[in-house]
């Protein structure tokens, strides 16, 4: 999901998506440790998606304070 698409979502929706992505990341790391993960690039994709969403949330916090 791109940053522009994330900005169109409500903050509560973004937080829910972050939560679900963190759960997915946990499962991916578990699969990696047990040798079951085939697509290791997915870990990087999920981490970057979480970072994008957290960035948008932080931008909103900063703009609300100004």
Curated annotation (Swiss-Prot):
Pfam families: Ribosomal_L29 (PF00831). InterPro entries: Ribosomal_protein_uL29, Ribosomal_uL29, Ribosomal_uL29_CS, Ribosomal_uL29_sf. PROSITE patterns: RIBOSOMAL_L29. The keyword Ribonucleoprotein applies. It comes from the Bacteria. The keyword Ribonucleoprotein applies. GO terms for molecular function: structural constituent of ribosome. Keywords: Ribonucleoprotein, Ribosomal protein. GO terms for cellular component: cytosolic large ribosomal subunit. One of its GO terms (biological process) is translation. Transmembrane segments: none annotated. CDD domains: Ribosomal_L29_HIP. PANTHER family: 60S RIBOSOMAL PROTEIN L35/50S RIBOSOMAL PROTEIN L29, LARGE RIBOSOMAL SUBUNIT PROTEIN UL29C. Belongs to the universal ribosomal protein uL29 family. This is Large ribosomal subunit protein uL29. It comes from Lysinibacillus sphaericus (strain C3-41).
